[in-house]
Amino acid sequence: MSISYNVFDIAVNPTYYSFEKLKLIVEKAKELKILPLFIGLDMETNIQVIHLSKMQQTLCYCGIHPTHINTLYKENNIWNILDIVQADLKQLFVENSEYIIAIGECGLDYYRNQLKIEQQRIFKMQLELSYLNIPYFLHMRNAFDDFYNIIKNYTNVTGVIHSFDGTVDQALALINLGFYIGINGCSLKNNIDLVKNIPIDKILVETDSPFCLIRKSYAGAEYGKVLKVKENEPVYILNLIEIISNIKQMPIQQLIHQFKLNTIKCFPQLKKFQ
């Protein structure tokens, strides 16, 4: 995997595609020097994305997504298995360190899942693995206050808050803690203020394929081409970067170069693709 890439799509959900479709979209992306990075969502999909990363010659993240915590427990037994799940995650990282570049996707989601206490416990359990010196691929939706109050206590945790749809002030507060902000089509749904106002050296770009296309009704749509496709895929990250360049009034190639540097700083294992 020593090929050089120009763009890293930091968020691709491979388990939502058939194997044949995944193979096709990865090949298309790599032809354009785009490397898709795969997301694990729970213990089952973590195993799958490691396997798919090996098959597709890419890298991945492994963790427990806040909306997938129901896969960990029946009734109220979650408190009895946190140590077991933490140990299982650690074993995954140790045994597959060549392919796993971050812990995640993990975080808090109060939009789709109201099990707030359970989410917080599972989030903290994963943050306690920071002694492994692995970056984090983080999720935060409708949960800024609790997310911030938890994450600020883990001063050795680094990484990106992906698919960011919060406010400019929230983004800047997280940037001040040392985090990067992941931008995709959903970040441009209601307004362009976020993209317009956060520094380019703190932005990572993503498609969150097959989700988060920029739709005609989105605020960001007037700054570029709206793709007439049903599903997102990694090659469309170039469309996202073009829209960001129009919003920020900066050359596309300058942004591509900066976003590549940012991603490598966030995930040092990507240095092999410089």
From Swiss-Prot:
Positions of disulphide bridges: none
Q: Signal peptide position in this chain?
A: none
**Recorded GO CC terms:** cytosol; nucleus
The EC number(s) given in the record are 3.1.21.-
Instruction: Please give the Gene Ontology molecular function terms for this protein.
Output: 3'-5'-DNA exonuclease activity; metal ion binding
- Print the keywords alphabetically: Hydrolase, Metal-binding, Nuclease, Nucleus
Question: According to its UniProt record, which cofactors does this protein need?
Answer: a divalent metal cation
Q: Where does this one sit in the cell? A: Nucleus
Name the InterPro entries for this protein: DNase_TatD-rel_CS, Metal_Hydrolase, TatD-like, TatD-type_Hydrolase
What's noted on cofactor binding?
A: Binds 2 divalent metal cations per subunit.
Binding locations of a divalent metal cation 1? E105, D208
Q: Which residues does the annotation say bind a divalent metal cation 2? A: E105, H139, H162
Claim: Transmembrane helix is one of the keywords in the record: no
Q: What is its main location?
A: nucleus
Reading the lineage from the top rank, the first entry is: Eukaryota
Q: Which family does it belong to?
A: Belongs to the metallo-dependent hydrolases superfamily. TatD-type hydrolase family.
Question: What does the function comment of this entry state?
Answer: Putative deoxyribonuclease.
State the name under which the record lists this protein.
Putative deoxyribonuclease TATDN1 homolog
Origin organism of this chain? Answer: Enterocytozoon bieneusi (strain H348) (Microsporidian parasite)
